[in-house]
């Protein structure tokens, strides 16, 4: 499994870095009970991020079964570029993004999303409370995410090679 991310801009580092750290923590935890191989690939924040991700993926010794992208805006152009190399989702790999962008539905991308309206409302409430000189009852909150399953993910199949024929188990 590969996590593709960019270096966070100072204004975005909390959310993006938390996603990366969450991925790393989950993989490190899963390593103890599974034969899990994982990697974090960092791509530039400029317009060449999808090409950089593509080059990094194709350079790996083994193409990953699953790709998790920091945002849908990395995942969607990557899907299109991988199709040019006959890498199709979910046949060859699964891919997931974050944020449920406007094109995620069109591309049938599986994605994670938080409720931006609720986040904005809670942030405004906290700001107004502080402006009024009051103490926050709950300064930190966990915002739940919703997984939207579409068509870019599938269970991993073990493929054994026997005289050039694949046997799926």
Please report, for each region that a protein language model flagged, where it lies by residue.
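Bacterial carbohydrate/catabolite-sensing allosteric modules
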Residues: 1-169
